[in-house]
Amino acid sequence: MARALMFQGTGSDVGKSLLVAGLARAFADRGLKVRPFKPQNMSNNAAVTADGGEIGRAQALQARAARVPLSVHMNPVLLKPQSEVGAQVVVQGRVVGSAKAAAYQQMKAGLLPSVLESFRRLKTEADLVLVEGAGSASEVNLRANDIANMGFARAADVPVVLIGDIDRGGVIASLVGTKTVLDPADAAMIQGFIVNRFRGDPALFGSGMDLIAGHTGWAALGLVPFYTGAARLPAEDALGVAGPQAPKPGAKVRIAVPILPHVANFDDLDPLDAEPGLEVRRIRPSDVLPTDTDLVLLIGSKATIADLAALRAGGLHHDIQAFARRGGRVLGLCGGYQMMGEHLSDPDGVEGPPGSTEGLGLLKVGTVMTGEKRLVAVTGTSRLGAPFSGYEMHIGATEGADTARPFAELDGAGAEGAVSADGRIMGTYVHGLFGDDRQRAALMGLLGAGPAQVAYEAGVEEALDGLAAHLSAHLDLDRLLSLAR
């Protein structure tokens, strides 16, 4: 049976996901059968598994790095936020309901058996299971019934490596402080630490590594320099998705993307960001739509009606509607497609409080939210004339006159999506479209951006190989492997 090693962090966004991905590729290159595992993830960025389940996108990237198919057991509990205090709960790939934060804390203990079952199943397939924790290991206020960090590590008897991020500052305090606040039995699970995202001369932090080791008693397992190739990998969470974007002076086409509170599957933007000829501008609902916009792209949402209300509250809906009236192009993906219709209805409160609302009125369609979720990989040919591969992940059924002009013909499934009579307004439920080089090239041709210059999926593979080489150069893989049990 496989050995396992868990990577926890001093906080969120310290690089746990990419470290696990890079190590998965590095150990797979050594001939080991590797499986990634994250007991609990919180993300609206999800991937579809072959059996019609869903897991966090970070675990999908890690599975790709390990060169193995996706499995719902790689992320047995996925929380998909629907509000500031509540989330949809997905267990072993299937939606089991929604829960407020306080109720979920009581629910967690009942989920541990499913988590351990998934972990055991992966161990039967692998030589090595690389486990990723969630958030911070030091959130001791949430320790009761924990399944994401030390609660899992102790239940499954998996040794832990703690990761700190020096790029954000305070890494010595964060690592030493974690040891200070942890229960002694939890702290004893930690076998060593890694300092991640270092910039500058490593010799200058040698004494820092010694200080941390001296205060904690943990082994110093490595100082990992900042990996610039990470920008070529899919976004792992929403932190920074609405952050400032550097202008692209050579870009011929500018795409405006409203970033709404419950944005989902935002990695649809990554392939577009990678193209030198496209400038993808994230804008807030309170912003004015830039006058030089060539395309408005409305992306996915975990709470479509609530996000449409946020768009209206900021006033940006007026600009989008005026842009469309002037002949501007608008494309909606999944939740964005639903917003573009004449009305949305959620009679059973699937995404939030029961109710209905007017849509943006850009397409002659309407959507009714239903409890049944469609999770499937798809292939087909779009109205842009190019074939594609992608996936659907949505609730809701959309019907109306404009569906007579579908956005795509899906192989084995028929017509999908809707297009306005003038062809300038389009909506589809398909995610992952623009990760397909053929479809991205077709969009760029339509917008006058020139030919596509990026082989996106090949670039992801190159970045994973580069990450594996980077970690191999700065970490002792044999020592890490010796810690696993």
UniProtKB/Swiss-Prot annotation:
PROSITE patterns: GATASE_COBBQ. GO terms for biological process: cobalamin biosynthetic process. It holds the Pfam family CbiA. Residues 252-439 form the GATase cobBQ-type domain. Signal peptide: none annotated. InterPro entries: Class_I_gatase-like, CobQ/CobB/MinD/ParA_Nub-bd_dom, CobQ_GATase1, CobQ_synth, GATase_3, P-loop_NTPase. GO terms for molecular function: ABC-type vitamin B12 transporter activity; catalytic activity. Keywords: Cobalamin biosynthesis, Glutamine amidotransferase. Pathway: Cofactor biosynthesis; adenosylcobalamin biosynthesis. The active site is at C334 (nucleophile), H431. Belongs to the CobB/CobQ family. CobQ subfamily. Catalyzes amidations at positions B, D, E, and G on adenosylcobyrinic A,C-diamide. NH(2) groups are provided by glutamine, and one molecule of ATP is hydrogenolyzed for each amidation. NCBIfam families: cobQ (TIGR00313), PRK00784.1 (NF001989). This is Cobyric acid synthase. It comes from Azorhizobium caulinodans (strain ATCC 43989 / DSM 5975 / JCM 20966 / LMG 6465 / NBRC 14845 / NCIMB 13405 / ORS 571). The lineage of its organism: Bacteria, Pseudomonadati, Pseudomonadota, Alphaproteobacteria, Hyphomicrobiales. The gene is cobQ.
